[in-house]
Amino acid sequence: MSNLSRKQQTQKRHRRLRRHLKGTAQRPRLAVFRSNNHIYAQVIDDEAQNTLCAASTLDKDLRTSLKADGSSCDASNAVGDLVAKRALAKGIQQVVFDRGGNLYHGRVKSLADAAREAGLQF
């Protein structure tokens, strides 16, 4: 049995993942952060250390169109679609998916599926 809390387990998984994930200019990293109320996605170039584009449930574009709060799978679908459109507008077609220590399930999975359907490759 693990004596770590759920948050500590997530942080441990995130550190383990980040050892191997690197975003480049040709293939930046799509980083996902999930809180209790919202979900955030950023496309990051780790070599230049800058964010190329981002989307979240707090965006003005999405706040008006979302019926429920930002903690649903529908909201995650909208964020995945929006971040993919913004990335494709900047000429980014391939990314490395960084789930941020979260399990690939639920809101994180729906964001990834929506980004794939919108045209991002990972």
Swiss-Prot record:
The record's CDD domains line, in alphabetical order, gives: Ribosomal_L18_L5e
A GO molecular-function descriptor: 5S rRNA binding
Family annotation (SUPFAM superfamilies): Translational machinery components
Q: Which GO terms describe its biological process?
A: translation
Keyword terms: Ribonucleoprotein, Ribosomal protein, RNA-binding, rRNA-binding
Domain of life of the organism encoding this protein: Bacteria
An example GO CC term for this entry is:
cytosolic large ribosomal subunit
Annotated region (Disordered), positions in chain: 1-26
UniProt feature, compositional bias: Basic residues: 9-22
| Cross-referenced Gene3D superfamilies | 3.30.420.100
Q: Please describe the quaternary structure of this protein.
A: Part of the 50S ribosomal subunit; part of the 5S rRNA/L5/L18/L25 subcomplex. Contacts the 5S and 23S rRNAs.
Primary role: This is one of the proteins that bind and probably mediate the attachment of the 5S RNA into the large ribosomal subunit, where it forms part of the central protuberance.
Family that this chain belongs to:
Belongs to the universal ribosomal protein uL18 family.
Protein's recorded name: Large ribosomal subunit protein uL18
Q: What is this protein's gene name?
A: rplR
